[in-house]
Amino acid sequence: MSRSLKKGPYINVKLEKKVLAMNESGKKAVVKTWARASMISPDFVGHTIAVHNGNKFIPVFVTENMVGHKLGEFSPTRTFRGHAGNKKK
């Protein structure tokens, strides 16, 4: 189920403030965040955001194609080790 359009997108307030402050100053520092549910806004383009996956922070460089998606989509939480294969004797 998608979010209601009348509510608007969820963007973490602290994350948005940090990115807007970096846009004004012209800095390009990595911003750490635990807000995986936060929507990527056009202000985030060109910045690197380190998204927590439950174990460590995964750096995500935001491009124009990512706008509208959520940050958690780009930092996988599970590692796929492959299906069980035939045992070789």
UniProtKB/Swiss-Prot annotation:
PANTHER family for this protein: RIBOSOMAL PROTEIN S19P FAMILY MEMBER, SMALL RIBOSOMAL SUBUNIT PROTEIN US19M
Function as written in the Swiss-Prot or TrEMBL entry: Protein S19 forms a complex with S13 that binds strongly to the 16S ribosomal RNA.
Recorded GO CC terms: cytoplasm; small ribosomal subunit
Keyword rRNA-binding: yes
GO molecular function, one term: rRNA binding
GO BP annotation list: ribosomal small subunit assembly; translation
Family under the similarity heading: Belongs to the universal ribosomal protein uS19 family.
InterPro entries reported for this sequence: Ribosomal_uS19, Ribosomal_uS19_bac-type, Ribosomal_uS19_CS, Ribosomal_uS19_SF
Keyword annotations: Ribonucleoprotein, Ribosomal protein, RNA-binding, rRNA-binding
A Pfam family matched in the record: Ribosomal_S19
NCBIfam families per the UniProt record, alphabetical: rpsS_bact
This protein's name: Small ribosomal subunit protein uS19
